[in-house]
A protein has these predicted regions:
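Active-site glycine- and acidic-residue-rich loops that bind
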Residues: 20-22, 52
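C-terminal lobe/tail of nucleotide-utilizing enzymes
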Residues: 31-107
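Inter-motif core of Ras-like GTPase G domains
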Residues: 1-19
C-alpha cells in the first residue's frame, strides 16, 4: 500500500478506530506515512463501538495533539440494515465533504 500511495502522489486520510489503543495506532500510522514521504491531511475516527463518550472526545483531542493532523469526523457505529449503499450514505452524513476536500486540496 505504501508504494501505491507514493505512486499516485496524493495526500492520505487515515481512518482510525475509537477503541483502546487508537491513539497509538493513529500516531504510528501517521509517522509511518511521513517516514515514507506520504502526506496525511486528515484523520477520520470510525468504529466507536462501546467507547465512553468522554474517552472518545479525549482520544480525538489527543490524536490531533500528538499528530498535528486534524480529525475531520467521528463516525458512530452504524445501526441499520447491512446494505453498503445505505451505510455509505449514512457515513456521509457525519462528514463535512466541503471541509474534507478543502483539507485535502489545501484550500
Amino acid at each position: 500500500f505504501t508504494d501505491f500511495m507514493k505512486d499516485i502522489k496524493l495526500p492520505a486520510i487515515v481512518v482510525a478506530d475509537g477503541r483502546l489503543g487508537s491513539i497509538n495506532r493513529a500516531i504510528l500510522t501517521c509517522e509511518y506515512a511521513k517516514m515514507h514521504g506520504i502526506e496525511v491531511k486528515a484523520i477520520i475516527v470510525n468504529d466507536t463501538t462501546a467507547v465512553d463518550p468522554f474517552l472518545l472526545k479525549t482520544n480525538v483531542a489527543d490524536m490531533e495533539r500528538y499528530t498535528g493532523i486534524p480529525v475531520l469526523a467521528v463516525v458512530p457505529p452504524y445501526q441499520g440494515p447491512d446494505i453498503q449503499k445505505v451505510q455509505l450514505g449514512w457515513a456521509r452524513s457525519f462528514i463535512d465533504s466541503k471541509k474534507l476536500w478543502n483539507t485535502v486540496l489545501g484550500l
